[in-house]
Swiss-Prot record:
Species this chain originates from: Rhizobium etli (strain ATCC 51251 / DSM 11541 / JCM 21823 / NBRC 15573 / CFN 42)
Family: Belongs to the MurB family.
Predominant subcellular localization, coarse grouping: cytoplasm
GO biological process: cell division; cell wall organization; peptidoglycan biosynthetic process; regulation of cell shape
Function statement: Cell wall formation.
Phylogenetic placement of the source organism: Bacteria, Pseudomonadati, Pseudomonadota, Alphaproteobacteria, Hyphomicrobiales
Protein name, entry field: UDP-N-acetylenolpyruvoylglucosamine reductase
């Protein structure tokens, strides 16, 4: 059942789109661009050629049209009714770069894979960024959510973020202005991150390589890296590990439709082949219910759920009461 009308939305933008150099796709299948390989259509998907093209598009986009920004498609779950409005997917050509930006500093485009930042740092003897080798996704998302691994978080290495707002105005946010906390930033949600500046410290390349190898080996041993998964499903509650709570609640390997909580790492939700957005979200809410009933702790989603439900296939979020 089609829930969006991309051609109509595209036509409403008028002649201004003729000057846009990036790719505009009406009714774009989101299951082709998300790591879960599930979900409905984006009413309109836009992939800007570069930052100037992005700004030009934003200036012709009416304020009432919803705008959803995605990265490489990790850490998101798209609902089966699709995403109304415009989905902005930054292009690798314009936003996938990574380069040196001074002594022990690296500048990366928002769509640059996290592991490419780690590799650039290693090649140039810059320590402190090796942890990105074990984080799936892109740098823009890592900056937005304060991604971390192996005891290190983005906020420890980030200097500033370059961004544009909904009207196409440029902004620079310092580390302090990002307002970081665990897996969260207080940066305005309407800002579109375009690049991120990091600073590390001098370190022997062989040592960095060893650290990266340890990160990779650990990840491949304990995480379902070859499955259709969006990464960690839930945040770790204070003083607890989400995976342990899920395991103790008996949800390791739990299956709903085509979705499963991984038997290898039970805080990873996987698409076993034909899972729908409904299957995945229903499974997540069921796990939240089971953990609360057995452990008295309410898990919070780390995966972002985007879009609208198909009529008759809504998933009611578990409310519960946060334990004291």
């Amino acid at each position: 059942m089609k829930q969006v009308n991309g051609e109509k939305l595209l036509a409403s933008l008028g002649d201004g789109v003729k000057d846009i150099r990036g790719r505009i796709t009406p009714d774009a299948p989101m299951d082709r661009v998300t790591w879960f390989r599930a979900g409905g259509l984006a009413e309109l998907m836009f992939q800007p050629h570069d930052i100037d093209d992005l700004i030009a598009f934003l200036k012709i986009l009416p304020e009432e049209v919803p705008l959803t920004v995605i990265g490489v498609g990790s850490n998101i779950l798209v609902r089966d009714g699709g995403i109304p409005g415009v989905v902005l997917r930054l292009s690798a050509k314009g936003f996938g770069f990574v380069e040196l930006a001074g002594e022990n500093r690296i500048l990366a485009g928002a769509i640059c894979p996290d592991k490419h930042v780690a590799a650039m740092a290693m090649d140039n003897g810059i320590g402190g960024l090796h942890f990105y080798y074990g984080i799936p996704g892109a740098i823009g998302g890592a900056a937005r959510m304060n991604a971390g691994a192996n005891g290190v978080e983005t906020r420890e290495r980030l200097i500033e973020v370059n961004a544009v707002d909904r009207k196409g105005n440029k902004h620079v946010l310092s580390n302090a202005e990002m307002g970081y906390s665990y897996r969260h930033s207080a940066a305005p949600t309407d800002l579109i991150f375009t690049s991120v500046l990091f600073e590390g410290y001098p370190e022997d390349r062989a040592q960095i390589r060893a650290e990266m190898d340890a990160v990779r080996n650990h990840r491949e041993t304990v995480q379902p890296v070859r499955e259709k998964t969006g990464g960690s499903t839930f945040k770790n509650p204070p003083g607890h590990s989400a995976w342990k709570l899920i395991d103790e609640a008996g949800c390791r390997g739990l299956v709903i439709g085509g979705a499963q909580m991984s038997s290898l790492h039970c805080n990873f939700m996987i698409n076993m082949g034909q899972a729908t957005g409904y299957d995945l979200e229903y499974l997540g809410e069921q796990v939240r219910r089971e953990v609360f009933e057995k452990e008295g702790i309410k898990l919070e989603w780390e995966i972002k759920r985007l879009g609208v439900f198909m009529p008759g296939r809504e998933v009611r979020p578990f409310q519960g009461v946060t334990s004291e």
